[in-house]
Amino acid sequence: MKSLVAHFSTPLITARLVPRCIIHRASISAVSFSTVRRRFSPLTMASAAQSSSQAVSYGSGNSDTDVFKLIQAHEEKAARLSPVEEIRTVLNGSICGMLSTFSQKYEGYPSGSMVDFACDADGSPILAVSSLAVHTKDLLANPKCSLLIARDPEDRTGLRITLHGDAVLVSEKDQAAVRSAYLAKHPKAFWVDFGDFSFMRIEPKVVRYVSGVATAFLGSGEFSKEEYQAAKVDPIAQYAKPVTSHMNKDHEEDTKAIVHNITSIPVESALMLDLDSLGFNVKATLQGNTFKLRVPFPRRAQDRKDVKTLIVEMLQAAKSN
């Protein structure tokens, strides 16, 4: 406990966010059932709710069903960010994506490029582009484009966001602010000051997303420019990397105890994936199955210090039960 408390008192650092599954305008589960669903029987919402407070006792023939019930019931009521807040937060924490432009060389065909980016204060992606790059020439001829971001590129069930918009050159009066925003995410990008480089802003038209592909909780939706820009970036998500790294390295058993106490699911392992002001997400395992669980905080976290306080409180509650 002492080392856990001491860690959270260290200086803060800003880190890249590690994204989560969401459903448009609803609080639906982020559980990954890529393997679990094949074993667990489909259940009604009513039967799931009846077992939300039950603990699983293994050795019985219906243990798989009990686990599915507990996961489903827990995930449906777990506190989480609204979908548009989640998307705004994930985009703000991301640093690279797939840019799609209209090819000038191969007319009528799309052209894809991996690009680094940073979001400005309004959530618009900023690109540092070279006049020599093919995608720059494409954008100058036709500004319509899209930017695809994966919260975790290695998780095919995870959140995918596509921002459609028009790429425009940043005006002279905005150069300093945009340069600062870009270098804050890419501090080693010294080439942005080269003569052939300039900044372009993708002005959003619509933001689409899909999550939970190949799981029991497939979801998709879209938000207008106004909805997207009105959403706020979660202030706690920036601390995800230092907190999760420390917890996974030094306190995995503590995380597992918290998950078991909150969900009643006797997970065999639990790795913290990310966090926000309302809670954190874990990748858990149980009897050969791997799935995601949402672990809500008892209340909204106010700052980095409060995250420490909440996790310690949750651990103390788990150890007292």
UniProtKB/Swiss-Prot annotation:
The protein's Enzyme Commission number: 1.14.-.-
Location of this chain's protein in the cell: Plastid, Chloroplast
A cellular-component GO term for this protein: chloroplast
GO biological process: heme catabolic process; tetrapyrrole biosynthetic process
Region (Dimerization): 96-116, 144-166, 205-208
UniProt keywords, alphabetically: Chloroplast, Heme, Iron, Metal-binding, Oxidoreductase, Plastid, Transit peptide
One Gene Ontology molecular-function label: protein homodimerization activity
Residues reported to bind heme b: S130, V134, H135
S-S pairs: none
Keyword Plastid among UniProt keywords: yes
Family matches, as InterPro entries: DUF2470, Haem_oxidase_HugZ-like_sf, Pyridox_Oxase_N, Split_barrel_FMN-bd
Transit peptide extent on chain: 1-45
Biological role stated in the UniProt entry: Dimeric beta-barrel protein binding to heme and catalyzing its degradation to produce biliverdin. May function in the tetrapyrrole biosynthetic pathway.
Quaternary structure and interacting proteins, as annotated: Homodimer. Binds to heme in the interdimer interface; the heme iron is coordinated by a fixed water molecule.
Protein name per the record: Non-canonical heme oxygenase HOZ, chloroplastic
Originating organism: Arabidopsis thaliana (Mouse-ear cress)
Gene name of this polypeptide: HOZ
